[in-house]
């Protein structure tokens, strides 16, 4: 018997730094969203992904985003609302050449406008993920 997640290539949750007991909210799911990425994340955190209607505080937001999905700044502002101060938003976009591809500049320009900064990116099969966080100075000001 092969353990789940060890038989089919990369562990996407590990690449994204998602681990047990983290609360992950998924935004922007559609038919083209990668079920392997979703399954790896659910297995790693030990629970199902929260949907868009959840009002829980979350550690990670997984935001599926395509070039025709609207205003990324507005969507990022919505994604920040449930995010813990040290939480992470992963903007997951189709990789270059795939339908719905988003230019990296769009994410780089939208993040600071939404009060976020991009720290890294990761390749996830046919998708590319950009890691966005709230600047430490902002988070530090909220700590007690």
Where are these regions (language model features)?
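S-adenosyl-L-methionine-dependent methyltransferase catalytic core, i.e., the SAM/SAH-binding region
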Residues: 1-144
């Amino acid at each position: 018997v092969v353990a789940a997640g060890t038989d089919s290539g990369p562990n996407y949750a590990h690449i994204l730094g998602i681990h047990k007991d983290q609360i992950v909210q998924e935004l922007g799911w559609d038919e083209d969203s990668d079920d392997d990425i979703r399954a790896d994340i659910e297995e790693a955190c030990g629970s199902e992904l929260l949907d868009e209607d959840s009002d829980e505080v979350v550690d990670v937001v997984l935001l599926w985003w395509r070039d025709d999905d609207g205003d990324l700044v507005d969507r990022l502002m919505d994604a920040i609302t449930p995010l813990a101060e040290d939480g992470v938003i992963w903007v997951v976009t189709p990789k270059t050449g795939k339908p719905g591809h988003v230019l990296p500049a769009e994410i780089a320009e939208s993040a600071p406008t939404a009060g976020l900064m991009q720290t890294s990116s990761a390749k996830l099969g046919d998708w590319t993920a950009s890691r966005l966080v709230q600047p430490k100075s902002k988070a530090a000001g909220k700590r007690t």
